[in-house]
Curated annotation (Swiss-Prot):
SMART domains: S_TKc. Disulfide bonds: none annotated. It comes from the Eukaryota. It comes from Dictyostelium discoideum. The modification Phosphotyrosine is found at residue 15. This is Cyclin-dependent kinase 5 homolog.
Length: 292
């Protein structure tokens, strides 16, 4: 750890404390993520080390680079590239008012990063505004990709805050174990809606409340809209029945093409959800000037 000198604590993330630090040799500013391990006595599981090592190979302009992994007996520290702020802070500072070209640019970059990881068979599983980082050039990069697989997603964060369910796909909320890349598309759709409307689309306070909020907006799913729903562990025949609302009446700030893309991302049936690669070709992005 002598290679890095801490500058300040940036916060407490899902997995541990995050520090801003400086590489003593190069002067480069980095973010150090201290991973808290539940099994203090057992040290770092080798499966986690394997998973993390693979993440060093994920090199893409819209993915936060993992520079280094420092593994001591009881601690694991991940050294990431440093970015100025996350999308949550950005949204708070704008008072939820993001310009339409910025929404389009951020969404395109988010989907580029997701598509790249999905091509490399890496899921995120916990996409939310807090782990989308932005720099002063308007570049957006995804943080924490692949960490869920290495360490699992805890119910509570390092600082005992409850990990948010607002961006969690309904198949996961209903106990699906067979999930794949579509779970990240659902989360990206929720983030898209939040950027456009200035507020979270489904701000639930627990698993049931989360599901019911989704039902109230998108309508309660059934076997017609979602053929395999009855096979899910948490499916109940007595779910409250709600009709579907037009997304345009809830998410203001998106044009027709944007709403069309959003509806394709927020499909109940994971098999019907648009892929990241297909989303990037959607007419909503026509005429976009890419940053990278």
């Amino acid at each position: 750890m002598e290679k890095y000198s801490k500058i300040e604590k940036l916060g407490e993330g899902t997995y541990g404390i995050v520090y801003k630090a400086k590489n003593r040799e190069t002067g480069e500013i980095v973010a150090l993520k201290r991973i808290r391990l539940d099994s203090e006595d057992e040290g770092v599981p080798c499966t986690a080390i394997r998973e993390i090592s693979l993440l060093k190979e994920l090199k893409h302009p819209n993915i936060v680079r993992l520079h280094d992994v420092i593994h001591t007996e009881r601690k694991l520290t991940l050294v990431f590239e440093y970015l100025d702020q996350d999308l949550k802070k950005y949204l708070d500072e704008c008072g939820g008012e993001i310009s339409k070209p910025t929404i389009k640019s951020f969404m395109y970059q988010l989907l580029k990063g997701v598509a790249f990881c999905h091509d490399h068979r890496v899921l995120h599983r916990d996409l939310k505004p807090q782990n989308l980082l932005i720099n002063r050039k308007g570049e957006l990069k995804l943080a924490d990709f692949g960490l869920a697989r290495a360490f699992g997603i805890p119910v509570r964060t390092y600082s005992h805050e409850v990990v948010t369910l607002w961006y969690r796909a309904p198949d996961v909320l209903m106990g699906s174990r067979k999930y794949s890349t579509p779970i990240d598309i659902w989360s990206a759709g929720c983030i898209f809606a939040e950027m456009a409307s200035g507020r979270p689309l489904f701000p639930g306070s627990g698993t049931s409340d989360q599901l019911f909020r989704i039902f109230k907006i998108l309508g309660t799913p059934n076997e017609e809209s979602w053929p395999s729903i009855t096979e899910l562990p948490e499916y109940k025949t007595d779910f409250p029945v709600h009709p579907a609302h037009q997304l345009s009446s809830i998410v203001h700030g998106l044009d027709e093409k944007g709403l069309n893309l959003l509806s394709k991302m927020l499909q109940y049936d994971p098999n019907q959800r648009i892929t990241a690669a297909a989303a990037l070709k959607h007419p909503y992005f026509d005429g976009l000037e890419p940053i990278n």
